[in-house]
UniProtKB/Swiss-Prot annotation:
It comes from Salmonella arizonae (strain ATCC BAA-731 / CDC346-86 / RSK2980). PROSITE patterns: G_TR_1, G_TR_2. GO terms for biological process: hydrogen sulfide biosynthetic process; sulfate assimilation. Its EC number is 2.7.7.4. It catalyses: sulfate + ATP + H(+) = adenosine 5'-phosphosulfate + diphosphate. One of its GO terms (molecular function) is GTP binding. Residues 25-239 form the tr-type G domain. Residues 206-208 are annotated as: G5. This is Sulfate adenylyltransferase subunit 1. Residues 34-41 are annotated as: G1. Heterodimer composed of CysD, the smaller subunit, and CysN. InterPro entries: CysN_GTP-bd, CysN_II, CysN_NoDQ_III, G_TR_CS, GTP-eEF1A_C, P-loop_NTPase, Small_GTP-bd, SO4_adenylTrfase_lsu. Keywords: ATP-binding, GTP-binding, Nucleotide-binding, Nucleotidyltransferase, Transferase.
Length: 479
C-alpha cells in the first residue's frame, strides 16, 4: 500500500472513515496543455511523485522504464508515469488524453494530460470540455508560442475561466526573474483578446527539479507567491451551472411497474424542489414535482450535478431528450443557432452537409447553413472560408430538423453543448458550443435523399402505429 495513503487511513481511524472523508472533499478537474515538449507529462508525474501518490511497484517500474525509454539521463523520467501508449514512449510525446487521479488533505483532483501537437487539437478539446481549470505550460527558453495561444483560446472557448500559466524549465534559464517577468507580460498582452472574465495566475517552476511544484523553491527567492499545488488546493471554483435556472434533460423513462413512472437524468443546472411547477419542452405541457427519488432515498430538494428520478403529479407525455425547466421560464425552442465548432474529421465541414446531432440526450438532425468565419487561433483573427478543415475552429450557422431547447454554452454546457455524428459511420466528427439562437422566418423543409423519402413512405404505409412523420410535410397538399 502507498505509505501516505496508509498514514491517511490510520489518521481517519480506518478505511470506512477515510472513504467518508474522501466523499466530502471538493473535486477539481484540471488539464495541462501547452506546446510540444513544454513538460506537461513531467509536471503531472512530479505532482504525483511529490504528493506521494505513487505505489512502490510503480516506482520500481518507473526506474526500469526510465532506463529504456527515459529522456533525462540517470534521473527518473516522470513523464513516463503518464505517457502510457507505446507510440508515446517511443516518440517521447503525448498523443491521447491521459487521465490521472490523486488527492491531498484538502482536495481531490482529476488531471487530463492533453497532447501539444497541433494535429491532436481535437484530443485537447475533448480533455478541456470537462475541466474547471487549465494549466498552460510555457518553456522559459521559448516564451509564448502559437500552440500556447491555441490552447488558451480553446480552453476559454470551452468555458474554462481559471488559467494557471506555469512557466516551466526555469532551471534552464538560471531561475532569472527577468525571464519570468517578460513572459508574464507577453502572455497578459495576448490574453486581453481572450473572451470572458478570466482568473489568470502565474507560477515559475521546474517540473524536472520540483521547484515551486509542491514545495517552495530555494532557487527563486524573488518569487513570493504560492506553489502550483497551493494554487490547485485553494482556487475557488464557482460553477456557472449553480447560478443558472433549473434544467433537467430526461435520459430515460423508468417504469418498472404499473404504479411507478419516473423520469431519470442528471440535473444540469440550478435546483428543484418537491411541489415545484415545471414545464416540458418542446411540448410546453406543465405539471408539478411529487417526488425526487435518489439512490439514498427520497429528497425534498436536488441540486446541479446530482443524478435523480423525478415523479410528477400528472400523467403527461415525456420521452428521452425532453427538457424539464421551471414553469415560469421563457425559454423557447429554436430551429436555428450560431454554433462555435471544433471540427474533428478528415473530411472538412462544408455548407449544405447534414449530420446527426446529440444534445443532452436529444438526438436529431441538422444541416450546415453557412460558415460565418474560421478563427485563426494563433492571432485570434477571423477569415472567410468555404469549409472548416480538421482541427479548424469557426462560427457556423445550423438548421435543426426540429426546434430544440438551447442555452448559451458559456451559461450551461450541458444544454448548450452538442456533438456532430456522421450518419453513415456513426463517428463523432465535431463538437459544438451554442453561441446564440438565430431568429429566422418560416422554416424551409430539410432536403432528403430519394432513398430516405422512399423508406419514410414505406414505414408510414406498413407501420402506421409508429407514428412516423411525413418528411415531405405540406408538399403533398401543394402538389
Amino acid at each position: 500500500m502507498n505509505t501516505i495513503l496508509a498514514q491517511q487511513i490510520a489518521k481517519e481511524g480506518g478505511v470506512e472513515a477515510w472513504m467518508i472523508a474522501q466523499q466530502h472533499k471538493s473535486l477539481l478537474r484540471f488539464l495541462t496543455c501547452g506546446s510540444v515538449d513544454d513538460g506537461k507529462s513531467t509536471l503531472i508525474g512530479r505532482l504525483l511523485h511529490d504528493t506521494r501518490q505513487i505505489y512502490e511497484d510503480q516506482l520500481s517500474s518507473l526506474h526500469n522504464d526510465s532506463k529504456r525509454h527515459g529522456t533525462q539521463g540517470e534521473k527518473l523520467d516522470l513523464a513516463l508515469l503518464v505517457d502510457g501508449l507505446q507510440a508515446e514512449r517511443e516518440q517521447g510525446i503525448t498523443i491521447d488524453v491521459a487521465y490521472r487521479y490523486f488527492s491531498t488533505e484538502k482536495r481531490k483532483f482529476i488531471i487530463a494530460d492533453t497532447p501539444g501537437h497541433e494535429q491532436y487539437t481535437r484530443n485537447m478539446a475533448t480533455g478541456a470540455s470537462t475541466c474547471d481549470l487549465a494549466i498552460l505550460l510555457i518553456d522559459a527558453r521559448k516564451g509564448v508560442l502559437d500552440q500556447t495561444r491555441r490552447h488558451s483560446f480553446i480552453s476559454t472557448l470551452l468555458g474554462i475561466k481559471h488559467l494557471v500559466v506555469a512557466i516551466n524549465k526555469m532551471d534552464l534559464v538560471d531561475y532569472r526573474e527577468e525571464t519570468f517577468a517578460r513572459i508574464r507580460e507577453d502572455y497578459l498582452t495576448f490574453a486581453e483578446r481572450l473572451p470572458g472574465d478570466l482568473d489568470i495566475r502565474f507560477v515559475p517552476l521546474s517540473a524536472l527539479e520540483g521547484d515551486n511544484v509542491a514545495a517552495q523553491s530555494a532557487n527563486m527567492r524573488w518569487y513570493s507567491g504560492p506553489t502550483l499545488l497551493e494554487v490547485l488546493e485553494t482556487v475557488d471554483i464557482q460553477r456557472v451551472v449553480d447560478r443558472q435556472p433549473m434544467r433537467f434533460p430526461v435520459q430515460y423513462v423508468n417504469r418498472p411497474n404499473l404504479d411507478f413512472r419516473g423520469y431519470v437524468g442528471t440535473l444540469a443546472s440550478g435546483s428543484i424542489k418537491v411541489g415545484e411547477r415545471i414545464k416540458v419542452l418542446p411540448s410546453g405541457v406543465e405539471s408539478s414535482v411529487s417526488r425526487i427519488v435518489t439512490f439514498d432515498g427520497d429528497r425534498e430538494e436536488a441540486y446541479a450535478g446530482e443524478a435523480i428520478t423525478l415523479v410528477l403529479n400528472d400523467e403527461i407525455d415525456i420521452s428521452r431528450g425532453d427538457l424539464l425547466l421551471a414553469a415560469n421560464e421563457a425559454l423557447a425552442p429554436a430551429q436555428y443557432a450560431a454554433i462555435d465548432v471544433v471540427w474533428m474529421a478528415e473530411q472538412p465541414l462544408t455548407p449544405g452537409q447534414s449530420y446527426d446531432v446529440k444534445l443532452a440526450g436529444k438526438k436529431t438532425r441538422a444541416r450546415v447553413e453557412t460558415i460565418r468565419y474560421q478563427i485563426d487561433i494563433n492571432n485570434l483573427t477571423q477569415r472567410d472560408v468555404e469549409s472548416l478543415p480538421l482541427n479548424g475552429i469557426g462560427l457556423v450557422e445550423m438548421a435543426f430538423d426540429e426546434p430544440l431547447a438551447l442555452d448559451i454554452y458559456q451559461q450551461n454546457p450541458v444544454t448548450g453543448g452538442l456533438i456532430f455524428i456522421d450518419r453513415l459511420s456513426n463517428i463523432t466528427v465535431g463538437a459544438g458550443m451554442v453561441r446564440e439562437p438565430v431568429e429566422r422566418g418560416v422554416t424551409p423543409p430539410m432536403e432528403y435523399s430519394a432513398f430516405e423519402l422512399e423508406l419514410n413512405a414505406l414505414v408510414r404505409r406498413h407501420f402506421p402505429h409508429w407514428n412516423a412523420r411525413d418528411l415531405l410535410g405540406d408538399k403533398h397538399g401543394a402538389a
